[in-house]
Curated annotation (Swiss-Prot):
It comes from the Eukaryota. This is UNC93-like protein MFSD11. The keyword Ribonucleoprotein does not apply. GO terms for cellular component: membrane. Widely expressed. CDD domains: MFS_MFSD11. Keywords: Glycoprotein, Membrane, Phosphoprotein, Transmembrane, Transmembrane helix. The chain crosses the membrane at residues 8-28, 53-73, 74-94, 96-116, 138-158, 170-190, 239-259, 277-297, 309-329, 359-379, 385-405, 410-430. PANTHER family: ET TRANSLATION PRODUCT-RELATED, UNC93-LIKE PROTEIN MFSD11. It is found in: Membrane. InterPro entries: Ion_channel_UNC-93, MFS_trans_sf, UNC-93-like_regulator. GO terms for biological process: response to food; response to starvation. The lineage of its organism: Eukaryota, Metazoa, Chordata, Craniata, Vertebrata. Belongs to the unc-93 family.
């Protein structure tokens, strides 16, 4: 297998492994609040929003030290161990207790920080300036296809149900745990890419022995250097500007992955289909994500206009979705009690409009995330692990804040927050992309997505 083929193989395996893991985890997140509402009529008392706020809060706090972990153990082992913790969190729902539920939330927050830093590192070392756009699109399309498969099962299994029984819950989460473990094992199929500089004849065996004896010291040095780079990157102009865009992706991630499905499940006007519509919503979010990731991956070598038009498309698509949701969904839907809400917004709640908005949310999200992955891989190709750690730090802390306020804010206020951050995030991304275009003009052969 040629070096380029090996790198492409690694990207595909990386995407497929994440597809399995996040088929389980994103489906879990999408239905968690609905499942817990049903559990709260028993001895269990908890909040899916609070759990996700803990996950993303710990995730953000852990991100600045994860480059050190990845530098020492490597991306492959980092992703495998993280996958085990993801599986543990999902398994908690088989027989949940408040203490195990919230404890697992803490552990998966740490695991997520390691996982995504390692993923960014793996993506970058298997790409160059010519392939980073294509590889970002391939990975994103495979990752987001996870939304399709898990939610397809939820749609058919929960059709006509108004409450989630213990048998339904256990069946779903046992299956999701197994799926997550399959994805975790797939990380072992990723091969180490061929080094650019092969050991020359002039280097003696003594040199290799010396390297082996100094490996422990080198690991400590790598860890310290990675941590220092993370802190330095936080205050660079490009990263500060991209942080506004990243903050927006954290807010809208919270909305489409946890809040919107809960809103749909709480609208009594949807009748007996309200719970199964959660699954259908997740499917159409996934279709939007897959379409966007595939399209921008295929166009990565041919676009002459850079990333800005794609981000602008994402902004417009999201703003249309937010307006339609504002018209279609009752304001109290995110915080409705277990009985749901009978309120009506500005139009009678429409299933078709709700599902269209799901598709638009997914398409817009893919616009932002594929371009952020691409520009980070280009600007920080030598410091990929710290750069992706800072990216995930900002994204996750904003997601945590959003999950926290989702317990209290009415829907229209949540939409307003996202519109404000979306507008300024788009402007700040444009500024960084113009800088990247200037780098290209000075002599780089990089082709932007």
């Amino acid at each position: 297998m040629s070096p380029e083929s090996k790198k492409l193989f690694n990207i595909v395996i990386l995407g497929v492994a994440f597809m399995f893991m996040f088929t389980a985890f994103q489906t879990c997140g999408n239905v968690a609040q609905t499942v817990i509402r049903s559990l709260n009529s028993t001895d269990f008392h908890g909040s899916g929003y609070t759990s996700l706020a803990i996950i993303y809060g710990v995730f953000s706090a852990s991100n600045l030290i994860t480059p050190s972990v990845v530098a020492i153990v490597g991306p492959q082992i980092s992703m495998f161990v993280s996958g085990l913790f993801y599986s543990m969190y999902i398994a908690v729902f088989i027989q949940p207790f408040p203490w195990s539920f919230y404890t697992a939330s803490v552990f998966i927050g740490i695991a997520a920080a390691v996982l995504w830093t390692a993923q960014g590192n793996c993506l970058t070392i298997n790409s160059d300036e010519h392939t980073i756009g294509r590889n970002s699109g391939i990975f994103w399309a495979l990752l987001q296809s996870s939304l399709f498969f898990g939610n397809l099962y939820i749609y058919f299994a929960w059709q006509g149900k108004t409450q989630i029984s213990e048998h339904d819950r256990r069946t779903v989460f046992i299956a999701l745990t197994v799926i997550s473990l399959v994805g975790t094992v797939l990380f072992f199929l990723i091969r180490k890419p061929d080094p650019e500089n092969v050991l020359g004849e002039e280097e003696s065996c003594d040199d290799q022995d010396m390297e082996a004896t100094e490996s422990a010291q080198n690991n400590v040095t790598k860890a310290v250097d990675a941590f220092k780079k993370s802190l330095r990157l936080c205050v660079t102009r490009e990263m500060l500007l991209l942080s506004v865009t990243t903050a927006y992706t954290g807010l809208e991630l919270t909305f489409f992955s946890g809040v919107y499905g809960t809103c749909i499940g709480a609208v009594n006007k949807f009748g007996t289909e309200e719970k199964s519509l959660i699954g259908l919503s997740g499917i159409f979010i996934g279709i939007g994500e897959i379409l966007g990731g595939s399209l921008f991956g295929l166009l990565s070598k041919n676009s002459r206009f850079g990333r800005n038009p794609v981000v602008l498309l994402g902004t417009l698509v999201h703003f249309v979705a937010f307006y339609l949701i504002f018209l279609n969904m009752p304001g109290d839907a995110p915080i409705a009690p277990v009985e749901g809400t009978n309120s009506i917004a500005y139009i009678r709640p429409s299933k078709e409009v709700a599902i269209l908005c799901s598709f638009l949310l997914g398409l817009g999200d893919s616009c932002f995330n594929t371009q952020l992955l691409s520009i980070l891989g280009f600007l920080y190709s030598e410091d990929s692990a710290p750069a992706f750690a800072v990216f995930k730090f900002v994204q996750s802390i904003c997601a945590a804040v959003a999950f926290f306020y989702s317990n209290y804010l009415l829907l229209h206020w949540q939409l307003l927050v996202m519109v404000i951050f979306g507008f300024f995030g788009t402007i700040s991304f444009f500024a960084v992309e113009w800088d990247a275009a200037a780098i290209v003009a000075r002599g780089s052969d990089y082709r932007s997505i």
